[in-house]
């Protein structure tokens, strides 16, 4: 979690408004019990040790995903953090926990299908905005914009089920370093790469 702390701190210093870290996916439950338990222990340690600093730095913490399925101590620590930072107005730090892009799209489709079945909505009237509103970043966190830049560390060339709908026009950077070794310097390199690009949003 040291890398995460450094990146959160550096994002705040750079004036970045939104930062989302993919901490635990819906697929990660398939890992060994020991590995899953270790991830949650690290999460609880980070939240408990850095809560005061997050509050002092005006960082607001949000969770994307159903964190209530996590172990009780993790849920308790997260809920305390969410409550203690809910009125902060600086960097919004989103932690994706028990989150999956396909999972939230499926739930959005189900919710819209129910409206169609009840006669509240015609299929031809379904819009991109309606789907976006039913996603985790819409229904629960309407103020979270689509990501401009996605940084995938360790040289892996895939999104791993992360914000699939929202990342339609995101710029992607793939540093070769592993996440624990991802430094503020590497972070700034990725940002500089992004800033050198011309965003086209599918126009050409």
Language-model region placement:
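Flexible, compositionally biased loop and terminal segments
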Residues: 1-204
């Amino acid at each position: 979690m040291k890398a995460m702390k450094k990146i959160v701190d550096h994002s705040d210093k750079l004036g970045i408004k939104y930062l989302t870290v993919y901490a635990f996916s819906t697929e990660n439950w398939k890992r060994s019990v020991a590995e899953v338990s270790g991830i949650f222990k690290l999460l609880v340690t980070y939240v408990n040790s850095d809560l005061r600093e997050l509050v002092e730095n005006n960082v607001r913490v949000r969770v994307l995903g159903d964190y209530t399925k996590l172990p009780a101590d993790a849920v308790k620590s997260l809920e305390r953090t969410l409550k203690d930072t809910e009125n902060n107005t600086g960097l919004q730090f989103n932690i994706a926990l028990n989150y999956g892009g396909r999972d939230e799209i499926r739930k959005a489709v189900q919710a819209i299908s129910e409206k169609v079945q009840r006669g509240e909505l015609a299929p031809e009237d379904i819009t991109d905005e309606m789907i976006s509103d039913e996603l985790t970043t819409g229904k629960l966190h309407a103020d979270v914009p689509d990501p401009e830049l996605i940084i995938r560390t360790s040289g892996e060339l895939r999104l791993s089920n992360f914000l699939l709908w929202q990342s339609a026009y995101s710029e992607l950077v793939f540093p070769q370093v592993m996440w624990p070794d991802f430094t503020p310097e590497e972070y700034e390199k990725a940002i500089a790469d992004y800033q050198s690009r011309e965003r086209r949003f599918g126009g050409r």
